[in-house]
A protein has these predicted regions:
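Non-ligating segments of multi-cofactor redox enzymes
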Residues: 1-205
Length: 205
């Protein structure tokens, strides 16, 4: 099994609902995001390029790419981050993490975050999934592909809450899975393929 995701850039309109769903479901501390949306457009933030009516603006939601050859795992000195061979998901073990930050430096996608201080929240009770990972001081965090939800037979929160239905999820080894069928026959790209990390997130272009 090899879990992966496809994101249709023709359907994504940059609303950031995926980022908010991720933050809420995982009860992420203040100032921490596992999911973000990058816009490819004009010279200034969130603007299109070109001259009306021929303008272009493309949105790329970015989270952990759950690489087949993760640079973060190769850099981690304690084995706290590794690729689960049964699911293909890159896991972060906070019990082993010493907060050294080498994985953050190694990741070419800039999707890892360090809890430098005691995690703080807008409210004093969990807002998200009670099975979501706990947050600890001086540990690194990242997208988990919502492993807690997958274990219950659900899909990642970012996919479930996407109003544009731009995300597809499933087993990349299964040609009949939603993600495999979404990729079939479409032009695709993966971020920074030249790094040799072999990401498990595909962008349909």
């Amino acid at each position: 099994m090899h879990y992966g995701m496809a994101i249709d850039t023709k359907l994504c309109f940059g609303c950031t609902a995926c980022a908010v769903a991720c933050k809420s479901n995982n009860n992420l501390p203040n100032n921490m995001w596992w999911n973000r949306v990058v816009t490819d457009g004009g010279k200034y933030a969130d603007t299109a390029r070109g001259i009306y009516p021929n303008v272009v603006m493309t949105h790329y939601p970015v989270n952990c790419q759950h690489c087949e050859k993760p640079a973060c795992a190769a850099a981690c000195p304690t084995g706290a981050t590794y690729r689960d061979e049964e699911t293909g998901i890159v896991v972060q073990d906070t019990e082993k993490c010493i907060g050294c930050g080498t994985c953050i430096q190694a990741c070419p996608y800039e999707v890892r975050t360090l809890n430098e201080g005691e995690p703080a929240y807008a409210v004093d009770f969990p807002l998200g999934d009670f099975d979501a990972p706990q947050h600890k001081v001086n540990t690194v965090e990242k997208c988990t592909f919502c492993g807690n939800r997958i274990a219950r037979g659900e899909v990642p929160a970012c996919m479930e809450l996407c109003p544009g239905r731009a995300r597809f999820w499933g087993d990349l080894d299964d040609p009949q899975s939603d993600v495999s069928r979404a990729i079939e026959g479409r032009e695709t790209m993966r971020l920074l393929e030249e790094e040799g990390t072999k990401p498990s997130v595909y962008y349909l272009v």
